[in-house]
From Swiss-Prot:
Protein name: DNA-directed RNA polymerase subunit beta'
GO cellular component: DNA-directed RNA polymerase complex
Record InterPro entries: DNA-dir_RpoC_beta_prime, DNA-dir_RpoC_beta_prime_bact, RNA_pol_asu, RNA_pol_N, RNA_pol_Rpb1_1, RNA_pol_Rpb1_3, RNA_pol_Rpb1_3_sf, RNA_pol_Rpb1_4
Organism: Aliivibrio fischeri (strain ATCC 700601 / ES114) (Vibrio fischeri)
GO terms, molecular function: DNA binding; DNA-directed RNA polymerase activity; magnesium ion binding; zinc ion binding
UniProt binding sites for Zn(2+) 1: 70, 72, 85, 88
Enzyme Commission number, as recorded: 2.7.7.6
């Protein structure tokens, strides 16, 4: 019988739903949920503690207080299950029904729901098209509203004040009706004809021309259509019945001393019931209108407070002056239902303790204290004890465990074997913050952690704590072992580099072991293999660092896994030969035959992983660690004060600098330099001195002179402990050593400006009081910053995760030919990242051809791994088009080919991988390392002088890209185009350097010329912008009248005169409309045409231009007609660090953005208005003229008659991503955001793969705006999900109809998260009330596609191992739609079984 009950219960699983819909509840629906009306405000009887009948905790309505027992105690026990007691009316059932049975309150007067009234934009107001202020006046009984105008001249929904109403009553009698309060609003809503409204509005949209009107109408139209489609009735926004929450969700707990702890909701409900009952009584008594009205208003206010306290007026407070927590407060915010209970739960079978080092552990192990293990694995131990017959009952087993009998420990050993546990360190910033280990039982009370995983956890042993969790089910154990085991997480998901990298002691040990020393004991010996080397070292015949010759055998594997053995004699040291014994077969000896620093060890592990695979690498990593620790101990490297050697040159250099500063001070006092110049010069002097002292000090520390075997002096690297620690990368850096032994240097104030007196002392000498005080100044700011940084970084991660959580790999291949074109990353002439590094792990979108031929190197859809990238490098391919997440055409999530390699595993990404969350974590996790500050240019920061020439750093040939140029008299090229670029290529055709060329740059080489390293190939004047002539001829001035449009200035020193054009604003009225121009004519005075065009060669001069020519003089091609002074642009603040990353992802518009050309065409200037310039572009494509107004103070980079391309920069400034998207397209904006974000991270030395940033950008581009609706149902100007539009368009095209046209939109991450399809996900992120209100009104349906929604409803997530389950369900759903539904089948079965059993019972 019991089994059958279980079976029937199991049939109605809650998981069997596919979507969640939210809507407005009708009064009937509320009554149908309810189990009875709550009539009294009483809660429980203070003497008996029994709930009062008909009160807020009534047992008759909500269910029994004790399991299977009615209130009066007449019926007890299971056998009366389902009986309703005739005395107290309580049903005999489980007490847990008190958690889900609801009640209701019949309101004596309708009440408006505050969410739909006050949550902006007010839904009620928008729907009725009445301002919110007016509606509130009606609701709170300040004015009347006309509900039925009848035959009068009044309008429907017109407001009347008390006096007006009385006047109209006298005038029209009962011809019309006007009411106040929620009833009036309810009547108005009830009498609205939705369909008619929709038709009116559609008509209005077609006829109106006003943009604001159109926007307003579209908004309202959307709302009305949503009401019609969702089947919501607008009058349901006014409540007539109020649901009452089940009592166990608003508990009342008696404390000792006769007091009660209660949920605030009970107070709020009591208020409502009291006022409602009073109102009913007043209505029965037919009390005067004014009293009833006041009571109705109070009822409205109390219901408002219950639903959302504090949204209107002052919040209702409890006895202790704090606002009561209303229903809305229960679900929103960090402590609300969503974030506290649904997205983050507490976990049983867990414990936490302090961590210590476990240097003897293997990589997959952790040390677990016995006491802890015993507690965590209790149930397993009980079952084992029972199973082996050592204990008869669970109770006996419990006793045995409590007594800690010897047998229990043996059993614990058994239980733990092969049962992984999860270790987690808070804050868990990326997925490596939780990993699985096999526990090893240890004495003591601290968890032991393997040192190599510290980097992933960001753990240290200064008191950090970690939590242990036990995976219970078999599936959980399987996942822990196969996916989360520390040995499976060797590579970082952010960059694909090893994250299991030795640091500190281990690095120092290996470094010490592989150093060489001149003339060490045993130098020049010949040794047979590492065994003999070890013997020589152990017996003291040879020192660790002695240079010797050793015979070694290398085993190398080629691509096909064929091994070749090679034995050879190599020059090496004893230490390196001994290290060779732990290196696995398959790696070359050369990889360890060098001094190993942190970088080299990282490469060693990376190489091992790529060539040997996971298993060997893990063993190797452990061996490296043990060896490193051992030799670090033997090295005896320690820091003493004498290790910090102060260079003698320091004192003389400091004295020289002080002398120089004194001179500048004197110059300043005699007025030769300004205060700003003096400050900058002083800071430059000290910065340079600091550098020199540091250099001297490092040279001093890093080398020492020793005698070699022949007794000659020789330089070798020093064995100074401090130097070794820094050089190996174990601890410290040159900058820190500089502070210890050089000079501390310049200090910054908290606002970022630099204090001009540096600290000349170092820590070895010690600081005096002044110096100490200056130090504390900046240091304190650093600490304050760190605290802020952590919070900001956490918030950025949260927003990123939220926006990207539903990007999961759904398909194998979406089949797109789109992609991004990758080129080497070049900055200021240096290759920052070569091409083969950037494309590693991507899939090729188009065949890669061998440069200069049609031979296909790599076919389309190849995943580029290390081997293929080498092919790319060898053939010096300079650009490759690769697939990208941004251009992926999958409707939901993305496809595997567009994503490419799973960085943490090194192979193609699997289906179901949640790449969005990984991307968010990879960008957010290093957030705490980024700086918080905005760099102010000043002092040391701006020392870089303005560049005025290009010197090439490599030998090769030069290549010009989209450059127009003319040849001047000297035979040099002069650039006449705006956005040209010059690159230097080596003999293999690889781009080595790249420079931007500005207009007017003079080149000494031509396209394709060979250059040598150090050649100066280009020069320009950084302070002015020239106007270059493209033809030769005679100068003729037009509209250049001295004193009106120009002034002549004579330089006092040289006596040369120059003409300066006046700004239009400064001219007299006569010169306002004149346009100073330089024209070129031939000898006969005829206009010269610009070659290849019909345009005369005339050059308009902007204000402030300087002309050095005389009227009638001759000029040659490529000469400068005029110069325009450039305001130096180096004084803007650079926003750096975290705030910059946040700005980029939020797609914020900068203050003064760059102005870009909206169309390709020819530029002209129109009439100027006050403060603005009118820019005209005659379009190439259709000859139309586009005009734009630009502020006068903006400096324009173009002249009249210039040709611009769409998206060209017209005025400099930071570019807005929105403009880039609109004018240059989706790939340009992706590249912009990627590069800008990478720049910030690169500064901090953090490596993140581009594809993570692209994944976020894809989510920012989720929405699009309809520009033309075609045959679709979309409205013009409507913002929709991109996927939905593409799906709809596909369908329209299939039916031969016209698809909708649209423009992609770029949304910031916060906006994008709130604009997701899923209202559950959006509500749990931010602005819960607004999201839910909107969703309810439009009757939204959540398809539960993302991860967050599924976590909230308590299912497996549709990613990772849960992906298969969801795929299966979707398949089943498709099958079910054909046959009868599964639920019907179960119901039929249940009915049959019921019929069979009930008779017997």
């Amino acid at each position: 019988m019991k089994d059958l009950l279980k079976f029937l219960k199991a049939q109605h699983k809650t998981e069997e739903f596919d979507a969640i819909k939210i809507g407005l509840a009708s009064p009937d629906q509320i009554r149908s949920w309810s189990f009875g009306e709550v009539k009294k405000p009483e809660t429980i009887n203070y003497r008996t503690f029994k709930p009062e009948r008909d009160g807020l905790f009534c047992a008759r309505i909500f269910g029994p207080v004790k399991d299977y027992e009615c209130l009066c105690g007449k019926y007890k026990r299971l056998k009366h299950r389902g009986v309703i007691c005739e005395k107290c009316g309580v049903e005999v059932t489980q007490t847990k029904v008190r958690r889900d049975r609801m009640g209701h309150i019949e309101l004596a007067s309708p009440v408006a729901h505050i969410w739909f009234l006050k949550s902006l934009p007010s839904r009620i107001g928008l729907l009725m098209d009445i301002p919110l202020r007016d509606i509130e006046r009606v609701l709170y009984f300040e004015s009347y509203v006309v509900t039925e105008p009848g035959m009068t001249d009044l309008e429907r929904s017109q407001l009347l004040s008390e006096e007006e109403y009385l006047d109209k009553l006298e005038e029209f009698g009962d011809e019309f009706t006007a009411k106040m309060g929620a009833e009036a609003i309810k009547d108005l809503l009830a009498s609205m004809d939705m369909q008619a409204e929709i038709e009116d509005m559609r008509e209005e949209l077609e006829t109106t021309n006003s943009e604001t009107k159109r926007k307003k109408v579209t908004k309202r139209l959307k709302l009305v259509e949503a009401f019609v489609q969702s089947g919501n009735n607008p009058e349901w926004m006014i409540l007539t019945v109020l649901p009452v929450l089940p009592p166990d969700l608003r508990p009342l707990v008696p404390l000792d001393g006769g007091r009660f702890a209660t949920s605030d909701l009970n107070d709020l409900y009591r208020r409502v019931i009291n006022r409602n009952n009073r109102l009913k009584r007043l209505l029965d008594l037919a009390a005067p209108d004014i009293i009833v009205r006041n009571e109705k208003r109070m009822l409205q206010e109390s219901v408002d407070a219950l639903l959302d306290n504090g949204r209107r007026g002052r919040a209702i407070t409890g006895s202790n002056k704090r606002p009561l927590k209303s229903l809305a407060d229960m679900i929103k915010g960090k402590q609300g239902r969503f974030r506290q209970n649904l997205l983050g739960k507490r976990v049983d079978y867990s414990g936490r303790s302090v961590i210590t080092v476990g240097p003897y552990l293997r990589l997959h192990q952790c040390g677990l204290p016995k006491k802890m293990a015993l507690e965590l694995f209790k149930p397993f131990i009980y079952s084992k004890l029972e199973g082996r017959g050592l204990a008869t009952t669970i109770k006996a087993a419990k006793k045995m465990v409590e007594r800690e009998e010897a047998i229990v420990w043996d059993i614990l050993d058994d239980v733990i074997r092969e049962h992984p546990v999860l270790l987690n360190r808070a804050p868990t910033l990326h997925r490596l913050g939780i990993q699985a280990f096999e526990p090893v039982l240890i004495e003591g009370k601290a968890i032991q952690l393997h040192p190599l995983v510290c980097a992933a956890y960001n753990a240290d042993f200064d008191g950090d704590q970690m939590a242990v969790h036990v995976p219970l089910t078999l599936e959980a154990q399987l996942e822990a072992r196969t996916l989360m085991m520390s040995t499976n997480n060797i590579l970082s998901p952010a960059s694909g580099d090893p994250i299991i990298v030795p640091s500190q002691d281990v690095v120092l040990g290996l470094y010490y072991m592989t150093r060489e020393k001149i003339n060490a004991k045993g130098e020049g010996m010949y040794l047979e293999g590492f065994a003999e080397a070890e013997k020589a070292y152990r017996t003291g015949v040879a020192e660790l660092h002695a240079r010797v010759k050793v015979r070694i055998t290398e085993v190398l594997r080629d691509e096909n896994g064929i091994e070749t053995r090679e034995t050879k004699l190599v020059d090496t040291t004893v230490g390196r030969a001994m290290l060779w014994q732990i290196v696995p077969e398959g790696l070359p000896y050369s990889i360890i035959n060098q001094k190993l620093g942190k970088k080299q060890i990282s490469n060693l592990l990376n190489e091992a992983y790529r060539t040997l695979g996971l298993k060997d690498t893990v063993v190797f990593a452990d061996q490296i660690m043990y060896t490193g620790f051992a030799y670090a101990a033997l090295s005896g490297a320690s820091v003493g004060i004498d290790d910090m050697v102060i260079p003698d040159a320091k004192y003389t250099k400091v004295a020289d600098a002080e002398e120089e500063v004194k001179q500048i001070q004197e110059q300043y006092q005699s007025g030769l330099v300004t205060a700003g110049e003096r400050y900058n010069k002083v800071i430059d002097i000290w910065a340079a001195t600091n550098e020199q002292v540091a250099k001297e000090m490092m040279d001093n520390l890093s080398s020492e002179t020793v005698l070699n075997r022949d007794g000659e002096e020789e330089q070798q690297e020093s064995f100074n402990s401090v130097y070794m620690m820094a050089d190996s990368g174990a601890r410290g850096s040159a900058a820190q050593i500089r502070q210890l032994a050089g000079m501390r240097g310049l200090m910054a104030k908290p606002d970022g400006s630099i204090i001009e007196t540096p600290i000349t002392a170092n820590f070895r000498e010690g600081l005096n009081v002044n110096q100490y005080f200056i130090s504390t100044h900046g240091a304190r700011k650093g600490l304050a910053d760190t605290a802020l940084k952590t919070a900001n970084s956490g918030y950025l991660t949260r927003r990123l995760v939220d926006v990207a959580q539903d990007v999961v790999v759904h398909l194998d291949d979406c089949g797109t030919y789109e992609g991004v074109t990758m080129t080497p990353l070049i900055e200021g002439g240096d290759v920052k990242e070569p091409l083969h590094e950037r494309v590693l792990g991507r899939v090729v979108a188009e065949d890669v051809l061998k440069p200069g031929t049609d031979e296909i190197l790599l076919p389309r859809n190849t995943l580029l791994d290390e081997k293929q990238c080498q092919i790319v490098e060898e053939n010096s391919v300079d650009q490759i088009k690769v697939r990208s997440v941004v251009s992926c055409e999958a409707d939901f999530g993305c496809c595997a080919n567009c994503y490419g390699r799973d960085l943490a595993r090194g192979h193609m990404v699997n289906q179901g991988e949640s790449v969005g969350v990984i991307a968010a974590q990879s960008i957010g996790e290093p957030g705490t390392q980024l700086t918080m500050r905005t760099f102010h240019i000043g002092g040391a920061a701006s020392t870089a002088a303005a560049d005025n020439s290009i010197q090439v750093k490599t030998t090769g040939s030069i290549k010009l890209h989209n450059a127009k140029h003319v040849t001047n008299g000297e035979g040099n090229l002069v650039i006449t185009s705006r956005a040209s670029e010059l690159t230097v290529i080596d003999e293999h055709g690889r781009t080595k350097e790249s420079y931007k060329l500005s207009y007017g740059t003079i080149l000494t080489k031509k396209d394709g010329d060979a250059v040598n390293q150090g050649d100066k190939i280009a020069s320009w004047d950084p302070h002015t912008m020239p106007i270059i002539t493209e033809v030769q001829g005679q100068v003729q001035f037009v509209d250049m009248i001295d004193g009106v449009t120009i002034t002549t200035q004579t330089d006092e020193l040289t006596g040369l005169s120059s003409i300066v054009v006046l700004d239009a604003a400064e001219r007299a009225s006569a010169g306002k409309d004149m346009r100073p121009t330089v024209k070129l004519v031939d000898a006969n005075g005829n206009d010269i045409m610009i070659p290849g065009t019909e345009m005369p060669a005339q050059y308009f001069l902007p204000g402030k231009a300087i002309v050095n020519l005389a009227d009638g003089g001759n000029v040659g091609i490529g000469e400068t007609l005029a110069r325009i002074p450039q305001a130096s642009s180096g004084t803007k603040d650079i926003t750096g660090g975290l705030p910059r990353v946040a700005d980029l992802f939020e797609a914020r518009k900068p203050k003064e953005p760059a102005i870009l050309a909206e169309h390709a065409g020819i530029v002209a200037f129109g009439k100027e208005t006050k403060g603005k310039v009118r820019l005209l572009i005659t379009r190439d494509d259709n000859g139309e003229v586009y005009e734009e107004m630009i502020h006068k103070h903006r400096q324009l980079n173009i002249f009249e008659g210039d040709k611009v391309e769409r998206g060209d920069v017209i005025s400099d400034g930071p570019e807005t991503p929105h403009d880039i998207l609109r004018l240059r397209g989706i790939h340009a904006v992706t590249e912009y955001i990627t590069n800008e974000v990478q720049e910030v991270y690169r500064l901090q030395g953090v490596k993140i793969n581009d594809k993570h940033i692209e994944t976020i950008v894809r989510q920012m581009l989720r929405k699009c705006t309809i520009t033309h609706s075609g045959d679709s149902t979309f409205l013009e100007g409507e913002q929709l999900e991109f996927a939905n539009v593409t799906i709809a368009n596909r369908q329209l095209e299939a039916e031969g109809k016209q698809p909708a046209r649209f423009e992609r939109d770029l949304l910031g991450i916060t906006k994008a998260s709130l604009a997701t399809e899923s209202f559950i996900s959006a509500a749990s992120f931010q602005e819960t009330t607004r999201v839910l209100t909107e969703a309810a009104v439009s009757g939204k349906r959540d398809e539960l596609r993302g991860l967050k929604e599924n976590v909230i409803v308590g299912r497996l997530i549709p990613a990772g191992t849960g992906f298969a389950y969801h795929q299966e369900r979707q398949k089943q759903k498709a099958v079910e739609q054909e046959g009868p539904s599964a639920e019907q089948a179960t119901d039929n079965l249940a009915a049959l079984l019921n019929a069979g059993f009930s008779s017997e019972e």
